[in-house]
Amino acid sequence: MRSWSAPKVPKLPGSGLPLRLYDTATREVRETEPSGKARMYVCGITPYDATHLGHANTYLAFDLVNRAWRDAGHDVHYTQNTTDVDDPLLERAQAIGVDWRELADREIELFRTDMEALRILPPRDYVAVTEVIDDIAEVIVRLMERGATYRIGDDVYFSVAAAPKFGAISGYDEETMRRLFAERGGDPGRAGKRNPLDWLLWRGERPGEPSWESPFGRGRPGWHVECTAIALRHLGPGFDVSGGGSDLIFPHHEMGACEGHVATGEWPFARAYVHAGMVAYEGEKMSKSRGNLVFVSELRHEADPMAIRLALLARHYRSDWEWTPDRLTEAEARLARWRAAVARPAGPDGAALLARVRERIADDLDAPGALALIDAWAAADGDDASAPGLVRDMVDALLGVAL
């Protein structure tokens, strides 16, 4: 599937530092150690509504990872999916009276436009689930061959008993797992399951639902195995970062990691699991089900997309925080100050600022710390004639903000 257009990224002098990120699985900030090529998979949207600021916050976080790796000299292989067949999409399409494919195509195109406006570097592989049904079925066959599955009618389930590493990503206790599984699309109470936490790999054909042929009958894939199959196809096991919002820690990333482990025999499925915090609005997490969304497509018609980007960068990527209009006002003022500063004929030492900003970004993407350093530079005087141009390029290359 077509990705979106890539902005030009300035080449900075010198080289970026090794990137350290908080790994959910080990509960510590540790160095990412890509061997030449850096491989990253970030879970994409289910395209049944427009991109909201919660989405933007997540994809901006991993855009910083992408940029930091590139600055350090790595060739980045970034893969992202879009879940273009799933229950919420089918339900929304039926509710508004359109074909589910039409709805998905429309929202995917809007997502592309939003990502371009925010200057998010595009993935090398932008993959729709409906493009890789055969690959997904192949992974399920491998799980079957390893005795990790069972059937309930025409549906195929993964057995938690076959996953020795289950729980290694989240570290959650069983009570928490059951609660989150029920809240996030699981079916712990379904009759016939061997364990309430067993999860769906393949949903047998239902009347009025899209379906595809497979070695185990017509149907469509479950959510978790979709990302497992796409990551294996494009990146292989042991890729550097698996990313998404913190609401994907469980069940999605936990279950996907187990599928990858059992299917390949290799652990870890990803070398680090990195998660962005949740954005709230009007007192609750921003989500489609709650209807408290701030859409990027609407906001960027009211404000410079670079101000939106700066508003998101002002909070550490792992933080949970609440959006208010004041945050955009503050970001617009910051953007104006920075643009005025790089328009000067000279400024304080640009090379020293670059070194310090690189340190902040390398330390678990401390974007707020980087912003504070640039604020101080913009407020000071200096006689380095090369500084304004260097700072303009630095802000573009590392933070993705065009001045």
From Swiss-Prot:
One of its GO terms (molecular function) is cysteine-tRNA ligase activity. It holds the Pfam family tRNA-synt_1e. The keyword Coiled coil does not apply. GO terms for biological process: cysteinyl-tRNA aminoacylation; mycothiol biosynthetic process. GO terms for cellular component: cytosol. A motif ('HIGH' region) lies at residues 45-55. Gene3D superfamilies: Anticodon-binding domain of a subclass of class I aminoacyl-tRNA synthetases, HUPs. Zn(2+) binds at residues 43, 227, 252. InterPro entries: Cys-tRNA/MSH_ligase (IPR024909), Mycothiol_ligase_MshC (IPR017812), Rossmann-like_a/b/a_fold (IPR014729), tRNA-synt_1_cat_dom (IPR032678). Its cofactor is Zn(2+). Keywords: ATP-binding, Ligase, Metal-binding, Nucleotide-binding, Zinc. Transmembrane segments: none annotated. The keyword Membrane does not apply. It catalyses: 1D-myo-inositol 2-amino-2-deoxy-alpha-D-glucopyranoside + L-cysteine + ATP = 1D-myo-inositol 2-(L-cysteinylamino)-2-deoxy-alpha-D-glucopyranoside + AMP + diphosphate + H(+). HAMAP family: MshC (MF_01697). Belongs to the class-I aminoacyl-tRNA synthetase family. MshC subfamily. Monomer. PANTHER family: CYSTEINE--TRNA LIGASE, CYTOPLASMIC, CYSTEINYL-TRNA SYNTHETASE. This is L-cysteine:1D-myo-inositol 2-amino-2-deoxy-alpha-D-glucopyranoside ligase. It comes from Thermobispora bispora (strain ATCC 19993 / DSM 43833 / CBS 139.67 / JCM 10125 / KCTC 9307 / NBRC 14880 / R51). The lineage of its organism: Bacteria, Bacillati, Actinomycetota, Actinomycetes, Streptosporangiales.
